């Protein structure tokens, strides 16, 4: 008797109902994310960026043994709190006399994981800085961001959600 592999770590919400009408987008985005490390889903509010990002992440969980992780940023008004929000998602604690981004990058380095940053537009510069630093330090990291505008980080691919 063989046992099933344990589920990958992560914090993605369960899909509450079926996902209809974006199958082609999901296929194209999954293929795209195999080649790029930063993907931003852009479009106006309410168009379905978050739902598409979460579904894509759920579909890609088998590709990321260290999990797929969602950080919801809608209620993060201050970009200076962004590293703390991301660190808390992973259970990473701040170290005295060390920038939190350095602690975060060290903890994630060598891990193959997918990070979904949701609702970045109101702190887009802070998100861009964080993503740029994490991608530079964590070669196996992939990032999906949702925003009304691109992050404008090096290597970012922008997908306009119709």
Which residues fall in each region the model found?
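Conserved adenine-nucleotide phosphate-binding loops and their immediately adjacent elements
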Residues: 1-31
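Generic detector of short, locally flexible boundary/turn motifs and exposed helical patches
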Residues: 4-8, 79-83, 107-110, 124-128
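A generic short alpha-helical patch detector that favors 3-5-residue windows
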Residues: 4-7, 21, 40, 74-78, ...
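Residue-level signal for pocket-adjacent positions within structured domains
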Residues: 7, 14-15, 47, 148, ...
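Residue-level detector of conserved, well-ordered beta-strand and adjacent loop positions
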Residues: 13, 20, 42, 71-72, ...
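Post-nucleotide-binding-loop coupling segment downstream of the phosphate-binding loop, primarily
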Residues: 18, 24-47, 51-112
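A conserved switch/coupling segment of P-loop NTPase cores
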Residues: 30-35, 52, 57-65, 98-162
């Amino acid at each position: 008797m063989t046992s099933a592999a344990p589920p990958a770590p992560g914090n993605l919400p369960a899909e509450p109902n079926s996902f209809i009408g974006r199958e082609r987008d999901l296929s194209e985005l999954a293929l795209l994310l195999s080649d790029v490390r930063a993907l931003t889903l852009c479009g106006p509010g309410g168009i379905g960026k978050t739902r598409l990002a979460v579904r894509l992440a759920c579909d890609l969980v088998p590709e990321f043994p260290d999990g797929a992780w969602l950080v919801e940023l809608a209620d993060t008004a201050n970009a200076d709190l962004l590293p703390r929000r991301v660190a808390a998602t992973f259970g990473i604690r701040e170290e005295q006399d060390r920038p939190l981004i350095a602690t975060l990058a060290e903890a994630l380095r060598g891990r193959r994981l997918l990070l979904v940053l949701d609702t970045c537009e109101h702190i887009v510069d802070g998100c861009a800085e964080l993503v740029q630093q994490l991608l530079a330090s964590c070669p196996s990291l992939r990032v999906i961001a949702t925003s009304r505008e691109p992050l404008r980080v090096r290597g970012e691919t922008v997908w306009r959600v119709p």
